[in-house]
């Protein structure tokens, strides 16, 4: 299963998300089967424009949005929501 994630290189939420994804992968072996393609929206704006999102990081499975970060979330909330996103992806396998 392959996810597409839109990011910005200096975005603090994107940096945090990468750390959280690595934490989740270390905790859950089954996440090794989920591939993530990270796309810098500033480097590929034409591709980013094809997807419906407002904030980064945002994750998609095909064109279905599975996750869009919020600046209001704590680190724990973001990790919980990323975990729920991975659960949803694994159910589709």
Q: For each predicted feature, which ranges?
A:
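Short alpha-helical
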Residues: 12-13, 43, 73
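Local sequence-structure signature of Cys/Sec-based thiol-disulfide redox active-site neighborhoods
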Residues: 1-27
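Structural micro-motif
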Residues: 51-61
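Secondary-structure boundary motif
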Residues: 26-30, 91
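Thiol-based oxidoreductase modules, predominantly thioredoxin-like and allied folds used
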Residues: 31-45
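Non-catalytic, surface beta->alpha helical segment in thiol-disulfide oxidoreductase systems
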Residues: 61-93
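A hydrophobic alpha-helix adjacent to the NAD(P)-binding/active-site core of NAD(P)-dependent oxidoreductases
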Residues: 48
